[in-house]
A protein has these predicted regions:
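Active-site loops and adjacent core secondary-structure elements that bind or stabilize anionic groups
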Residues: 1-199, 214-232
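Gly-rich Lys/Arg/Thr-decorated short loops/hinges at beta-loop-alpha junctions or inter-strand turns
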Residues: 23-35, 109-115, 189-208, 285-307, ...
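Conserved helix-loop functional segments at active or binding sites
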Residues: 53, 227, 264-268, 353
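Flexible, glycine/charged-enriched surface loops at secondary-structure junctions
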Residues: 57-65, 164-167, 230-237, 267-279, ...
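Active-site-proximal loop/turn and secondary-structure-junction residues that shape catalytic pockets
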Residues: 70, 125, 237-240, 248, ...
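C-terminal binding/interaction regions
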Residues: 72, 117, 121-122, 135-165, ...
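Glycine- and Gly-Pro-enriched alpha-helical subdomains that act as flexible
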Residues: 72-112, 242-342
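Nucleic-acid 5′ end/cap handling module spanning
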Residues: 220, 228, 235-238, 245, ...
Length: 392
């Protein structure tokens, strides 16, 4: 099959719509269930590239959670801690495969943004992963294969309409890309730049300490950024993106946005949050929304009399600004990557407030000296990669 007709394009008025191979060859995908749309396929093909490259670079099962052609989260398949299981709504005794852990962690980066996501898996989808997907609000998944049990589980989701796409893992795209804008065709070479540990050798700070986990985190961050709409900044810890700032015109706004998301991720581990007593049978999205409001400055919206009873069995104590600040100050060992250079040291100042100890960015600012001096002030290890990673 070299063409697949779609219901419409980005919006219902944009018809006709299809995906096809210009050279007349067969599409490298098979739709096993559902009817994916135009944006679904944009998410699918971008997210597949991300997880394929992350698996190749780390030799670990990798997953991503995409919304509107940018990752809400991405991660490698490391085991979940007891706290991870609690904040990601996983049963304590659940038997999880590495690829299931990868997706649970990817979705856990920003569960609000992952609502209605497109999932991407580097490895064959098994029953453990399918069962977790089934419990979440998700639009579809792309993977190189599915076990029979996993496929049957996924076919029961969304009243049988869940989108399941299988991609040929050996497919190699053409070296040139084309895109039409306003009737004008753009051409460029594919971004085949390989991101691996060799990219991390130019350490420009006084502190040269770069443990193996930090190298993995830098790779996870940079590959995530490679498929994030620019400008973009990504915070990572233990092989998991914990804050992705995408599509901002200002670098510092990217760093702030991603940093706030990283802070929100960490606040979900605060003892007061872990101790919240939710009403029985609360839906996962409602629980996610409640946690988000509770940890924000708008906490009164959910703790007001006559309101909190809809969500909690017992009225929670306020998580004060002082408590939040003190908790976030205990965060450490975080890595941050940027798809282009930090123009000033203010990005480093903001990043270190979210526990950043390691930075990977291209370098090349006329104020690199100021950026390096700021990193040195806090004992941060920073690599200049020399490679910009814009994505549009």
């Amino acid at each position: 099959m070299n063409e697949l007709e779609l219901k419409y394009g980005c919006n219902p008025n944009q018809k006709p719509s299809r995906i096809f191979m210009k050279d007349g060859s067969d599409l490298p995908i098979t739709v096993l269930n559902g009817k994916p749309g135009y944006i679904n396929f944009l998410d699918a093909f971008n997210s597949w590239q991300l997880v394929r490259e992350m698996k190749a670079a780390t030799d670990l099962p990798s997953a991503a959670s995409f919304k509107h052609v940018s990752p809400a989260g991405a991660a490698v398949g490391l085991p979940l801690s007891d706290v991870d299981k609690k904040i990601y709504f996983v049963d304590e005794d659940a038997e999880l495969s590495p690829i299931a852990c990868a997706y649970i962690r990817a979705r856990g980066a920003d569960r609000l943004c992952s609502y209605g996501d497109w999932a991407a898996l580097s490895d064959i989808c098994d029953a453990a992963t399918a069962n977790y997907l089934k419990a979440e609000v998700s639009d579809g998944v792309i993977a190189p294969g599915y076990t029979d049990e996993a496929l049957e589980i996924l076919k029961t989701k969304k009243k049988g309409g869940y989108n399941v796409v299988q991609i040929d893992p050996d497919y190699v795209p053409a070296p040139q890309e084309y895109k039409d804008v306003f009737g004008i065709t753009f051409q460029q070479g594919r971004n085949n730049f390989k991101i691996d540990e060799e990219l991390l050798t130019n350490i420009v700070t006084e502190n040269h300490d770069l443990p193996q986990q930090a190298k993995i985190d830098m790779i996870v961050s940079l590959i995530t950024l490679k498929y994030t709409q620019s400008n973009s900044v990504c915070y990572v810890k233990d092989g998991q993106a914990i804050g992705v700032g995408a599509g901002q015109q200002s670098r510092i706004h990217c760093t702030r946005l991603a940093g706030q998301k990283a802070d929100n991720w960490y606040l979900r581990q605060h003892p007061k949050v872990l101790g919240l007593q939710f009403v029985d049978n609360i839906r996962r999205p409602d629980r996610d929304n409640a946690i988000d409001v509770y940890t924000s400055d708008e906490y009164e919206d959910i703790l007001a009399d006559g309101v909190w009873q809809n969500t909690f069995k017992v009225k929670p104590e306020i998580l004060t600004a002082e408590e939040k600040k003190a908790w976030i100050a205990t965060q450490s060992g975080v890595t941050v990557g940027s798809d282009a250079f930090f123009p000033f040291g203010d990005n480093v100042e903001r990043a270190r407030k979210s526990g950043v100890q390691y930075i990977a960015e291209p370098g090349g600012s006329i104020r690199d000296d100021h950026v390096i001096a700021t990193a040195n002030k806090y004992g941060i290890t920073m690599c200049f990669t020399g490679m910009r990673l814009f994505h549009h």
